[in-house]
Amino acid sequence: MVELSGNIPFLWRLSPESSEGFCMVSMVVPFESEDEEEESRDLTIETSVVSFSSDSSRSEREEMLEWNQDDMSLFLKLVTYHQQGANAPAVESVRVDLTDPEIIDIIHVVAAAGFGTAYASEGILLDSVGRYPPHLCDLGSFAALNTVDGFKRCVVVDMDGEDVVGVLLDEIDVVSIGEYDKLDRHDLLMVKQTDLLHPDFATGLVRPPHATLH
């Protein structure tokens, strides 16, 4: 169990994956030993997120970047939700088990938010306006999307007016639209605020309260 806060210099490691500008993204947590004779060690958590750089010289060498405030805020919000529920107040530090699969998944989400490239949602989403009640969200909120492959979960990671970017928590089979086979977990999708539905829609268990079906 480790206590993490904004004072710890979390790092991203971008490791060249190909000569075409793609880099694999890993999280690095530096640990300094209090014993001067003990060698300091870093903890590295690999993710499935791929970053693309149009600057070929940058993509040819490993690069280390510090987490920014957006990274840390999203991480703390998602960890707090995981540990205490949706109505927990914002915190400045958390104690986490970095071997916990749920925490590792949160790290994937934060990496995707910072380095992923968003797909357009044209042809992937079904129209929900007037059929299902919209779900008011802010950054770090969970939502459901009504897709050609059923309701799928996502985390809101960017908002600009009506435009929203979500990190997918479920894969979407999109063979029917002909461009590619599927969108994977932790891919980014650009949607509209009116596309965001209550996350309970994606559980398949119950219909959210106040949901109207026509």
Can you describe what each PLM-predicted range is?
Residues M1-F151, E171-R185, T194-H214:
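Mixed-charge, low-complexity intrinsically disordered regions
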Residues V191:
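Internal alpha/beta domain cores that form substrate/cofactor-binding pockets in large enzymes
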Residues G150-V167:
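Short beta-strand-centered aromatic/proline hotspots
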